[in-house]
Amino acid sequence: MSIIRSERYSAIFLLCSAALAIIFANVLDPDTWHAVHSAVSEYHIFGLITPHDIVADFLLAVFFFAVAIELKHELVKGELSSFSKAIIPGVCAAGGILVPISIYLSVASVLPNGWPVPTATDVAFSLGILAIFGSSLPSKVRIFLLALAVLDDLAGIVIIATAFSVSISYWWIIVACITVGLFGFCSYRLARCKTSKTFLIIPAMLLCALAAWVSVYQSGIHATIAGVMLGIMLNRKQGAAIEHALEPYINGIILPAFAFLAAMVRVPHLPLDEISPALWGILLGLLFGKLLGISVFGIIALKFFRKKSISFFNLLVVSALGGIGFTVSLLMNELAFLGTPVHEQGVIAVLIGSLLSAILAIILMRCYKGRKSKSLPGTKGRVSH
């Protein structure tokens, strides 16, 4: 379990899942691929839900449940608990959203649905890359990246809830609010009841959570929002333990499974003039939009508020890591383009943009390590391994 909890191995699992998916999709002949794709996306288990929806709607709701727990902790007692702590990551997060959107719309204005795709940061992947290659960086870089990613996730939640909601059923929304409220009440009671009574409250919480998910799923709002609502309503005392318990399943099963399904596309053989502008918009938005948005807005905020919370070089590292959209960007791409010819090109753009951002971040971290080695006494001329 300790390996699966590791940020390093989480990033490796995600990368391997995406790579295997692309290989799998492209070695199959077209007929077999079509049959597999139809089985995953069109076959309804018991006539209720497809395997794709189980992963993208149900399992990802569990991931967003954990994200909401982390977000609540950071807002109440963590790195976002006060204005002075939150202002620099907040400005950086705003820049990391606004600039990629601007780049995307300037390049792909004919396909405006895709503007949310380059706004996301994959917290698991970016922290994993930092853990593998950034061991020589100060610990505050991880804290800053985590705060930035949490705010990015918050923005992503708002985007999913507003931009990708269709045919809203207010009746189901009312039912969802009631069940989420009951979940919160049960959580409150669980924190204060005797151990002997927990066997009654825990099943009630699970039933309320399932009912809330079904209600949101039926409401027209993306079902992952159910996980967010439940995570926010969970009693803070229980949050850390539940998040810790879910961590190996999220890192080892849920995120790799979604990465595999989302990246399972056939690479089209297209001439340059047939490449969708959405591909360029997403790619440039992730690679350059995130880098410029986070770093430029961050520099302005540091100067304006006279803060020294992070150095310019470390801010560049965080900016590059912010361009690793991966799983969350793949989700946004599905919501924006699934069922259209642009979808596969969007997946390729997310994967290439995230990979190039990761490579840029690794180069910057290696430069920092080399510079640090030269500055230490007695290390002149040594090769840093």
UniProtKB/Swiss-Prot annotation:
Top-level lineage group: Bacteria
Catalytic reactions on record: Na(+)(in) + 2 H(+)(out) = Na(+)(out) + 2 H(+)(in)
Gene Ontology annotations of biological process type: regulation of pH
GO cellular component: a single term: plasma membrane
Subcellular location(s) per record: Cell membrane
Gene behind this protein: nhaA
GO molecular function: sodium:proton antiporter activity
UniProt function note: Na(+)/H(+) antiporter that extrudes sodium in exchange for external protons.
Keyword annotations from UniProtKB, A to Z: Antiport, Cell membrane, Ion transport, Membrane, Sodium, Sodium transport, Transmembrane, Transmembrane helix, Transport
Family designation: Belongs to the NhaA Na(+)/H(+) (TC 2.A.33) antiporter family.
Keyword Transport set for record: yes
Entry protein name: Na(+)/H(+) antiporter NhaA
Main location: membrane
InterPro entries the UniProt entry points to: Na/H_antiporter_dom_sf (IPR023171), NhaA (IPR004670)
Record-annotated disulphide pairs: none
Transmembrane regions: 9-29, 45-65, 87-107, 114-134, 155-175, 198-218, 220-235, 245-265, 282-302, 312-332, 345-365
UniProt xrefs under HAMAP family: NhaA
Topology with respect to the bilayer: Multi-pass membrane protein
